[in-house]
Curated annotation (Swiss-Prot):
SUPFAM superfamilies: Amidase signature (AS) enzymes. This is Glutamyl-tRNA(Gln) amidotransferase subunit A. Gene3D superfamilies: Amidase signature (AS) domain. HAMAP family: GatA. Allows the formation of correctly charged Gln-tRNA(Gln) through the transamidation of misacylated Glu-tRNA(Gln) in organisms which lack glutaminyl-tRNA synthetase. The reaction takes place in the presence of glutamine and ATP through an activated gamma-phospho-Glu-tRNA(Gln). It comes from Mycobacterium ulcerans (strain Agy99). Heterotrimer of A, B and C subunits. GO terms for biological process: translation.
Length: 493
């Protein structure tokens, strides 16, 4: 069973299709691993054992009947971030205000996973409403990094990344608002991709910041991530921001990249995303990765994106502004937690009491910042200025891609930091998003692929690869080439 759960998803899918292993056997092995290890990691908030085994049995039945499998990943189980709605499991978004809530509908992404024959093992832990960089803001307790139990796994989707690193699941889904897929991937030596905004449906993704949120695939290899990306991407009429366009051949790009030939590929190193404030071991790993890309034949040059210096400030005005609007729906009137509804309090008092008890400190902080930024006296000075910076950041990237095909940077400024180190220092926590959030502001795509272990502390480091909107295939070509040249890494457990 140990060899089975440590296999990559592509290998497992091939074994299922060849009837060398059953989907039920694999799903049960993953459930057994969760049961044996999750008291240490707390990657999951809810386990859907019955539902997952039923989905796996359906794949086995179809195979036995000689039917064609619904996808290349049919029967390979997955961990789903608890921000996507599911009719058969609770959706809490890591918040007390939604404790025990069950959605009356599946997210479009959830439906696509089910249609592909992918068993959903359960819902993974996350920072409350995807607000955080460490998964310490969950109302249900923090997730621990399998590489070091005293360190964070990143956030907001630390549960999905930890589940992969702990071999609890071969596939996972996250959401990325400012780096919530890529940053945990970097800290756990897994692969995470933020697809182009609008290419993966947001219908049923509980909103944090609607113009920034994007669901995406996570796995332990670039090819596995590409295969999952192919399953979840595509136009959805239920999402008004969904792009009605052809999705790039990400699987083909990953397979082509595995040959290790990057001749003719132009790679830009972002000047603003390295230097002071970065951990020496992270920079050393990044420089080694750039040297490896050069050795594979890529043409590497430095690229200047001057407005990246203002990205953090712009992001932390735009995101809270959208949060303050989106989270107004949690009013204790329709669903979720309700405090003080005993006939002695007005509706306004019930709402205030419920929100005070149901939201955690970081969520309240961002609601307050957003309400202030959107207020009549400060809208132009803060929110409008932030949107102007957002436009300039997108222009920086558009200009950069005139001379290069992809950009690269460290995925995070440091390796995983100790639990509790930044939880009471919001500014330090926000700075951890420095490398990843510019892509969300621009709507472009990005990947974090493991680039080794830091010589400083032996913890994982991630290489971030960035590409223009609708050029997601470039991520997979470069990522797969680098992964093949880098070779295997030690495992967390």
């Amino acid at each position: 069973m140990t060899d089975l759960i440590r296999s990559d998803a592509a290998t497992l899918a091939a074994k299922i299709a060849a009837k060398e292993v059953s989907a039920t056997e694999l799903t049960q092995a993953c459930l057994d691993q969760i049961e044996a290890t999750d008291d240490r990691y707390h990657a999951f908030l809810h386990i859907g054992a019955h539902e997952a085994l039923s989905a796996a049995a359906a794949v086995d039945t179809a195979l036995a009947a000689g039917e064609r499998l619904p996808s290349a990943l049919a029967g390979v189980p997955l961990a789903l971030k608890d921000v996507f709605t599911t009719v058969d499991m609770p959706t809490t978004c890591g918040s007390k205000i939604l404790e025990g809530w069950r959605s009356p509908y599946d997210a479009t992404l959830t439906l696509r996973l089910r249609a592909a024959g992918i068993p959903i093992l359960g819902k993974t832990n996350m920072d409350e409403f995807a607000m955080g960089s460490s998964t310490e803001n969950s109302a249900y307790g923090p997730t621990r990094n399998p590489w070091n139990l005293d360190r964070v796994p990143g956030g907001s989707g630390g549960g999905s990344a930890a589940a992969l690193a702990a071999y609890q699941a071969p596939l996972a889904i996250g959401s990325d608002t400012g780096g919530s897929i890529r940053q945990p991937a970097a800290l756990t030596a897994t692969v995470g991709v933020k697809p182009t905004y609008g290419t993966v449906s947001r219908y049923g993704l509980v909103a944090c910041a609607s113009s920034l949120d994007q669901g995406g695939p996570c796995a332990r290899t670039v090819l596995d991530t590409a295969m999952l990306h192919q399953v979840i991407a595509g136009h959805d009429a239920k999402d008004s921001t969904s792009l009605e366009t052809e999705i790039p051949d990400v699987v083909g790009a990953a397979k082509a990249g595995a040959s290790g030939d990057l001749r003719g590929v132009r790679i830009g190193v972002v000047k603003q995303l390295r230097g002071d404030g970065y951990q020496p071991g992270v920079l050393a790993s990044f420089e080694a990765a750039v040297a490896q890309l050069t050795a594979l034949g890529a043409e590497v040059s430095e690229v200047d994106c001057p407005h990246f210096d203002h990205a953090l400030a712009a992001y932390y005005l735009i995101l809270p502004s959208e949060v303050s609007s989106n989270l107004a729906r949690f009013d204790a009137m329709r669903y979720g937690l309700r405090i003080g509804d005993d006939g002695t309090h007005s509706a306004e008092e019930v709402m205030a009491m419920t929100r005070a008890a149901g939201f955690g400190p970081e969520v309240k902080r961002r609601i307050m910042i957003g309400a202030y930024a959107l207020s009549a006296g400060y809208y132009d000075a803060y929110y409008n200025q932030a949107q102007k910076i957002r436009t300039l950041i997108a222009r920086d990237l558009d200009e950069a891609y005139q001379s290069v095909d992809v950009l690269v940077s460290p995925a995070t400024p440091t390796t995983a930091f100790p639990l509790g180190e930044k939880v009471d220092d919001p500014l330090a926590m926000y700075l951890f998003d420095l490398c990843t959030l510019p892509l969300n502001l621009a709507g472009h795509c990005g990947m974090s692929v493991p680039s080794g272990l830091s010589p400083d502390d032996g913890l994982p480091v991630g290489l971030q690869i960035m590409a223009p909107a609708l050029a997601d295939d470039r991520l997979y070509r470069v990522g797969a080439a680098y992964e093949a040249a880098r070779g295997p890494l030690p495992s967390a457990i």
